[in-house]
Amino acid sequence: MKAIRNGILIVPDETGHFCSREGLTLLYDEKIRAIRPEGKDAGHADLEEVYDAGGAYVAPGFLNVHIHGCDGADTMDADSDALDKMSLFQARTGVTAYLPTTMTCAFSDIAHALCTIRHAMHGDAHGARVLGCHMEGPFIAPSKKGAQDAAHILPADFSTIEPYADVIKIITVAPETLPDDAFIKACTAHGIVVSIGHTAADYETAAHAIEAGAHHITHLCNAMTGLHHRRPGVLGAALDSTANCELICDNVHLHPTMQRIIYHAKDGKHLILITDSLRACGLGDGPSELGGQKVTVRGTLATLADGTIAGSVLCLNDGLRIFRTNTGAPIPSIIEMVTRTPAKELGLYDEIGSLSEGKTADFAIFDRDFRMRRTVVGGTTYYKK
């Protein structure tokens, strides 16, 4: 048994939403065994480790549901060593579980990546745990492809992805390319979250897709129709719904004011902060690559040769800090956006996503500026400052 003391714990209140509590000790092994008032653990003479958090925040481990790569590795490398590298780097940023994200490439390459992810799902964690895949493309709109390769865009066909239904947890699709609701219904019946993204849909089409079961929005505002007072677009449909909306809070993909507008429009709920990072994340300025396309990184901006934004170089803990600066949102509410909300959406909240007795011992420990102190995955410390 191990213990964490002298921290500010982010825990569920009586409504289920998060609040901060001091004066508690957290006892754990591979699971959270107890959360008690400090001093009540004195009888545990068998404690093998006691960590003094020194007044830092102790939160559930973060979930990153949209990440292509980091530290020189990419999901489309379709290589177990690449996923291990991503897992270790993600743990440094407070992430304890994530969805390696594919992109629009030859489907044979996507299939290879999905098989590699399947293997990682059932293997031992080497840092952050691989939960499955976010499949971004190839079922998208050519006019909103962003940094995806238009040559490999395909019409949506559930039979194409059915062999990988156990691996795909979220799939991004342009709803205007669907002839009916059959694809959305088939995905949801197999436990796959359908996300609206890379889409030129109008408001009515997007709103219908949400009603049909597409309850997730891929990187809100980016690669979709925007808000106009006579044409509300996908953005309007997303804001006027309970769909969970991904946000890339690097101040490149979303202006600070837009982050604040979205936060208030959604009443602080149904938001999931992501990175959408590429392999250049963590490597600094210079040339990189995304799906065979040349990328240049300068500061926080990653672009293709034509100037198209090509994902981010954002670390998730930095995104939380930026979002707090821009919105003034309370830290417990921000933590819900990378724990409780995605865990509930993925059907995993009974296992992860909160500091609750019996759940997996996944922790992110950080200071007021979201600088990481320690990351614990399944009771094992994978990062410490």
Regions found by a protein language model. Give the residues of each.
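Conserved, mostly hydrophobic/aromatic
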Residues: 135, 187, 217, 323, ...
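Active-site core of metal-dependent hydrolases
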Residues: 165-283
